[in-house]
Amino acid sequence: MTERKLIHIFTDGSCLGNPGPGGYGIVMNYKGHTKEMSDGFALTTNNRMELLAPIIALESLKEPCRVVLTSDSQYMRQGIMTWIHGWKKKGWMTSNRTPVKNVDLWKRLDKVSQMHTIDWQWVKGHAGHAENERCDILARSAAEANPTQIDEGYQP
């Protein structure tokens, strides 16, 4: 059996105004090679961008991989590691019996994460972590670039 490739992924989301223009930034490292991705949306939220970044990164992988995914978003990390199990059992409802926010993205993240073996890591934002800082710049730049793309799942 072939060993899965080990990919290091760093992600961040940004939103100006929250809601407002937003963007995500991704840095991917594999065997000394680095790939960066970013994109912006006209109207979204910070949490949606924090979720979309790992989705886009994981969906870009062409085969099942071992992934170390690092983000400064406790919302994303806690959600995918802990909360999602209860939400799925309750039909995507919270413990307060309200619909889970950003359910479209949570479902996408759940689906794509099952294809890979993922170590979900958290890093404190704006604390000098090089890849996280780079993701922050990419995400903020995408949000500031007057994006016109529509975040179809955003519901104010």
UniProtKB/Swiss-Prot annotation:
Alphabetized CDD domains for the sequence: RNase_HI_prokaryote_like
Chief localisation class: cytoplasm
Domain RNase H type-1, chain residue ranges per copy: 3-144
Free-text cofactor note: Binds 1 Mg(2+) ion per subunit. May bind a second metal ion at a regulatory site, or after substrate binding.
Catalytic function, reaction form: Endonucleolytic cleavage to 5'-phosphomonoester
Enzyme class, broadest EC rank: hydrolase
Entry keywords, A to Z: Cytoplasm, Endonuclease, Hydrolase, Magnesium, Metal-binding, Nuclease
Disulfide bonds: none
Cofactor(s) for this UniProt protein: Mg(2+)
Record: residues binding Mg(2+) 1: 12, 50, 72
GO cellular component terms listed in the entry, alphabetical order: cytoplasm
Enzyme Commission numbers on file: 3.1.26.4
Listed GO biological process terms: DNA replication, removal of RNA primer
GO molecular function annotation: magnesium ion binding; nucleic acid binding; RNA-DNA hybrid ribonuclease activity
Binding site for Mg(2+) 2: 12, 136
Subcellular location(s) of the protein: Cytoplasm
Subunit organization: Monomer.
Similarity-based family: Belongs to the RNase H family.
PANTHER family to which the protein is assigned, alphabetical: RIBONUCLEASE H1
Function of the molecule: Endonuclease that specifically degrades the RNA of RNA-DNA hybrids.
Protein name as it appears in the record: Ribonuclease H
Underlying gene: rnhA
